[in-house]
């Protein structure tokens, strides 16, 4: 906690220096950072963190996939005007230090994985969180957005890995938000149109699918209430009050416990997900807010070719809903997944073709072994 506090002091000092140099208006804690329109990035690129294959998703595929990204998160970001770069798990700290300075923000998605799995979602999240803090402390602007499990991960990392979530019962629960009296002091809701606030406060438009909750008491017990602002709460099926929206008081880090991407892009049957015009409208608000935060980041890839090598368009998307998944579509990644090599890489077309053939052979063998025909696998 002391280390983060000192970084925050440095952030304030550096931001004040940036104010003098760039003419931006930077106001502390209870106020908002404003950046002149001319300096806004009109081509934001946002990273979305992959995660381990869930048991249910892995069981539906014979292929040896090791991680995935639900396509609804990709569409959520793209629908607000940004491009997406997948961020891999099971990588060294150096990888995250190298990729984040090219991006304008990171989305930590919801899902079904554990924080104690080695080299997985949470470990990658730790690297991302630390690098994001440094980028902001150095005078940049780098937002993080956590949805559901991603929101839980943000506070887990802020607590230096001390588990503070409570078991709760908020699965398949559509709710309005119970706003705090001072919620308008937040960056997330300071300029939200009254119509959006009215819908959020009165209609069952937030889709909740979580078995863990974070309460205000949890934050206070760890001293996190000094750094994080709670804007709204909700009650689970059993009457437990939990935090539903949160943001860091200085850093551009945001968390929501519900799933706005599901209202717009998930069509799984028998799920309590509202698809009314009002539900779509408020869900789009959250996407727009996050992407507009990312527009305040001036970081860039080296050039257009560099972006093209990294964007998620390079990877196929699967119709997982056809297999009764809770996601309509997913990007499924093998363990050796990577970004495309530069155009001037030393490999020639012949060696590339050979590598593709070898990869196909290895996948076929793994599939054969998984189907318990080991003796016939060659």
What are these regions (language model features)?
Residues 252-256:
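Catalytic His-Asp charge-relay segment
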Residues 3-250, 260-378:
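N-terminal beta1-alpha1 cap of cysteine-dependent amidohydrolase-like domains
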């Amino acid at each position: 906690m002391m280390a983060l506090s000192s970084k925050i002091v440095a952030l304030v000092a550096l931001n004040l220096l940036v104010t003098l140099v760039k003419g931006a208006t930077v106001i502390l804690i209870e106020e908002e950072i404003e950046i002149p329109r001319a300096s806004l990035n009109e081509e934001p690129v946002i990273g979305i963190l992959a995660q381990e294959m869930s048991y249910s998703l892995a069981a539906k595929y014979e292929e040896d996939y090791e991680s995935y990204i639900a396509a609804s998160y990709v569409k959520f970001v793209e629908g607000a005007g940004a491009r997406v770069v997948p961020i891999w798990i099971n990588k060294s700290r150096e990888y995250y230090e190298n990729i984040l300075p090219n991006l304008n923000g990171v989305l930590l998605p919801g899902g079904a994985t554990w924080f104690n799995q080695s080299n997985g979602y949470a470990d990658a999240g730790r690297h991302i969180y630390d690098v994001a803090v440094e980028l902001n402390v150095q005078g940049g602007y780098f937002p993080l957005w956590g949805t559901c499990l991603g929101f839980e991960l943000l506070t887990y990392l802020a607590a230096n890995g001390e588990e503070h979530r409570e078991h709760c019962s908020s699965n398949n629960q559509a709710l309005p938000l119970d706003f705090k009296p001072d919620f308008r002091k937040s960056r997330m809701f300071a300029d939200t149109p009254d119509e959006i606030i009215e819908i959020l406060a009165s209609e069952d438009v937030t889709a909740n699918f979580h078995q863990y909750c974070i309460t205000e008491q949890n934050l206070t017990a760890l001293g996190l209430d000094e750094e994080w602002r709670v804007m709204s709460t909700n009650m689970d099926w059993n009457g437990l009050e939990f935090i539903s929206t949160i943001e860091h008081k200085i850093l551009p880090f945001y968390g929501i416990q519900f799933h706005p991407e599901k209202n717009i892009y998930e069509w799984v049957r028998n799920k309590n997900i509202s698809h009314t015009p009002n539900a779509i409208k408020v869900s789009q608000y959250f996407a727009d807010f996050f992407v507009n935060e990312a527009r305040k980041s001036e970081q860039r890839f080296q050039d257009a070719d560099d972006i093209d090598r990294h964007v998620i368009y390079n990877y196929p998307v699967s119709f997982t809903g056809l297999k009764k998944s809770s996601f309509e579509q997913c990007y499924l990644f093998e363990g050796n997944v990577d970004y495309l090599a530069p155009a001037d890489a030393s490999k020639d077309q012949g060696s590339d073709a050979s590598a593709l053939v070898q990869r196909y052979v290895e996948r076929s063998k793994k599939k054969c072994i998984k189907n318990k025909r080991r003796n016939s696998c060659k």
